[in-house]
């Protein structure tokens, strides 16, 4: 709320004062009332949180590695992935007066609450312990994807009705601090709200591309990140017409060579690969392994008692885009007798609320006093355990070593300066342009996922992991699970293998002192992997011009990726249009195309005709163009033609519409005769001069409304013709199967319906 209040002050909707006592108001008279927010990590989180309120004056946000849902930061599909309790620790660290008590002695603001605040921390600690990794009210109030509805204490309903500003979302595809699902949740929120939303996805970890504290710069497709911000903010805060709002929906860095690809959509993958786990039989995995054992999980492709691994060959370069779904039909092996003592002890401790002395808990010398152990039981008398982790990994494997990012001893990517600098100006220190040091490996983890065996109904949305949906597990009973791996964009090279690894707990996320496991049915366990194929791009210029592009001719391009071409006519000629795979398409001399198949693009040119003088010379070609329509499309077999030649027009109406008429006019506005050849094809003979093709589409209401008669409308009635007209056109359909009710009053709603059908 504090950030929201500042925005309200900047827009003139809230009063502010010079201090707490003088009652002297101060206005932000220097503000134009247009506000943007940006920041990384917690700063990116607050951007998204404030946007979820729909506050007036917030024109755009640029969250970097931000959190959309605090539940997803430390939990996944009903299981805790970083300790059951965390929110209280964050609240402690955000309370400067609590941490630095010596600086705030006799503080009139802090003194009244300094005894109450620890109780608040313990309350939210106990709320998390009670949920034990499940989604509930505690997390709903910290789930910004739900907007104000979530803050009211209810579970998210995915209405997204509070987001009313554009967003440029920035995230590292190798960020394991704030996992990649967070950018997907943000993207969904803005997209479902109908807002202009863009993604910049780099191969880094938890960083800002222009990293001020490091004085380093990871260029975004050759452009500085701060330069992109400058254009974005200039457009949305100062109404500069610089085209920033038209940047690609997705700008993503490739894992193979560090190059960049632009995509028309994040969710536009074209195919799904199925990685199967066998045709029959059952497989069992257990948790009887150590952290050291886990470090050797991927040394080979042989399944063990600790993990099952399945592979498939990759024959062509393939891009994984989005969220892989791993379907598992499994039954738990709980070893309930081993848990009896722990369960009984848990019931005893549950008599009084658990608590933590946060000042001691946060002191590294006193951490032993922090009673923060995970709970792995429901209760002693339930006969069922809770919080049993099921884990999955998707792996890129190759017999031949391939390049990946090198890590230092702390697990961070090692930066290398390229020798180039990003000039900052104003006497500030320039940023060194960097890339990531590479090393050789035979495997790399592409994506991971975790869920609770006791939450088989948990899905991608956080609230699907609600505690009320938890089940009491029964050994021998099979449950259907879907693990959602973290979203990614990753290219697997031809000749590699994709491997799916299934196991129990991830030692980086949880620890279990007691053994458990699960058995799954092989035939009903598999991964659905969303992928984009690669296609060949070819482009050329017809006679009398040239064409340039931001991609190489003959390039292999990922499905849904974008290429921008510019056509330049030779002297004495004009650009006359584009042809894509032999079909004419609309567009100016500079046009961006989406690639979804092998594509050949040709730029066409015609002789330039002066506006004065004696007309075109015999045999020269002139332009054929088509007017755009929202309810259908027109393609022309040639975009320029000479007088007397035959031009073929193909018309295709959208679903629910049909062609009403096709009008072709010459340069003087005279109608040109058209021949209907059937199947949506029409021809005409090219006249002298430029020709324009204009289709008109109308709603196709089928035969249901045609020639319909009504028992209360007689042929001689004065309104009979009007009733027939609106009925035949599908504008009105009466009040029943054979009644029109011509004397009824027409309401505003009815009028709006008629207008919508026009």
Predicted regions and their residues:
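Short, solvent-exposed alpha-helical surface patches in non-cytosolic proteins
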Residues: 718-729, 736-758
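Accessory cap/linker subdomain of secreted extracellular hydrolases
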Residues: 3-12, 16-30, 38-40, 47-162, ...
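Surface-exposed interfaces of beta-sheet-rich extracellular modules
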Residues: 562-589, 646-682
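Intrinsically disordered, low-complexity Ser/Thr/Gly-rich stretches
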Residues: 284-534
């Amino acid at each position: 709320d504090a950030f929201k209040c500042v925005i309200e002050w900047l827009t003139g909707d809230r009063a502010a004062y010079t201090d707490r006592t003088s009652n002297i108001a101060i206005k932000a008279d220097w503000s134009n009332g247009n506000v943007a927010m940006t920041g990384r990590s917690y700063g990116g989180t607050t951007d998204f949180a404030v946007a979820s309120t729909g506050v007036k004056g917030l024109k755009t946000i640029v969250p970097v590695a931000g959190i959309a849902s605090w539940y997803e930061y430390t939990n996944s599909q009903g299981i805790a992935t970083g300790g059951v309790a965390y929110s209280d620790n964050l609240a402690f660290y955000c309370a400067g007066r609590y941490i630095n008590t010596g600086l705030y002695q006799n503080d009139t603001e802090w003194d009244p609450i300094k005894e109450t605040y620890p109780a608040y921390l313990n309350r939210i600690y106990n709320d998390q312990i009670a949920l034990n990794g499940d989604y509930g009210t505690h997390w709903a109030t910290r789930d910004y994807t739900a907007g104000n509805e979530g803050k009211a204490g209810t579970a998210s309903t995915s209405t997204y009705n509070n987001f009313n500003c554009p967003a440029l979302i920035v995230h590292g595809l190798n960020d394991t601090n704030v996992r990649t699902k967070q950018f997907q949740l943000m993207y969904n929120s803005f997209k479902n709200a109908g807002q202009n939303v863009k993604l910049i996805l780099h191969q880094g970890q938890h960083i800002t591309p222009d990293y001020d504290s490091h004085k380093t710069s990871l260029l975004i497709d050759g452009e500085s990140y701060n330069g992109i911000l400058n254009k974005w903010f200039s457009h949305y805060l100062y109404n500069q017409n610089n085209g920033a709002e038209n940047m690609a929906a997705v700008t993503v860095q490739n894992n193979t060579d560090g190059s960049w690809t632009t995509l028309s959509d994040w969710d536009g993958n074209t195919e799904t690969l199925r990685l199967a786990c066998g045709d029959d039989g059952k497989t069992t995995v257990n948790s009887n392994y150590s952290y050291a054992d886990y470090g050797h999980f991927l040394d080979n492709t042989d399944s063990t008692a600790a993990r099952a691994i399945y592979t498939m060959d990759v024959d062509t370069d393939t891009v994984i885009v989005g969220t892989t779904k791993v379907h598992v039909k499994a039954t738990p092996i709980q070893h309930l007798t081993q848990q009896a003592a722990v369960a009984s002890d848990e019931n005893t401790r549950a008599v009084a609320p658990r608590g933590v002395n946060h000042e001691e808990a946060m002191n590294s010398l006193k951490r032993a006093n922090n009673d923060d152990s995970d709970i792995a039981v429901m209760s002693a008398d339930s006969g069922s355990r809770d919080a049993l982790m099921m884990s999955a990994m998707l792996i890129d494997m190759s017999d031949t070593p391939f390049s990946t990012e090198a890590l230092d001893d702390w697990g961070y990517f090692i930066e290398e300066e390229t020798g180039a600098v990003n000039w900052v100006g104003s006497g500030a220190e320039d940023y060194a342009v960097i890339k990531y040091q590479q090393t050789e490996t035979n495997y790399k983890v592409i994506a991971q996922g975790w869920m609770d065996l006791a939450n088989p109904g948990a899905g991608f949305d956080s609230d699907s992991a609600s505690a009320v949906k938890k089940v009491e597990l029964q050994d021998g009973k099979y449950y259907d699970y879907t693990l959602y791996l973290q979203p990614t964009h990753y290219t697997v090279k031809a000749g590699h293998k994709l491997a799916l690894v299934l196991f129990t707990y991830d030692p980086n996320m949880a620890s279990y002192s007691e053994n458990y496991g699960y058995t799954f049915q092989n035939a009903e366990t598999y991964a659905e992997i969303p992928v984009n194929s690669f296609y060949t791009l070819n482009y050329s210029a017809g006679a009398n011009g040239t064409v340039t592009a931001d991609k190489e001719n003959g390039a292999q391009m990922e499905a849904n990726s974008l290429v921008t071409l510019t056509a330049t006519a030779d002297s004495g000629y004009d650009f006359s249009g584009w042809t894509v795979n032999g079909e004419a398409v609309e567009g100016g001399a500079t046009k961006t195309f989406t690639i979804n198949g092998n594509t050949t693009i040709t730029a066409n040119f015609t002789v330039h005709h002066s506006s004065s003088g004696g007309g075109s010379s015999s045999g020269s070609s002139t332009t054929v163009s088509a007017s755009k329509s929202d309810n259908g499309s027109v393609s022309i077999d040639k975009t320029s033609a000479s007088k007397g030649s035959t031009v073929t027009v193909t018309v295709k109406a959208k679903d629910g519409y049909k062609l009403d008429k096709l009008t072709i006019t010459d340069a003087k506005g005279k109608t040109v005769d058209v021949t209907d050849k059937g199947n949506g094809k029409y021809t005409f003979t090219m006249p002298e001069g430029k020709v324009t093709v204009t289709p008109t589409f109308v709603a196709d209401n089928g035969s249901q409304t045609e020639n319909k008669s009504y028992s209360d409308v007689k042929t001689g009635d004065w309104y009979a013709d009007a009733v027939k007209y609106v009925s035949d056109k599908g504008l009105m359909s009466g009040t029943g199967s054979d009644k029109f009710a011509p004397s009824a009053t027409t309401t505003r709603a009815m009028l709006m319906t008629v207008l919508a059908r026009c």
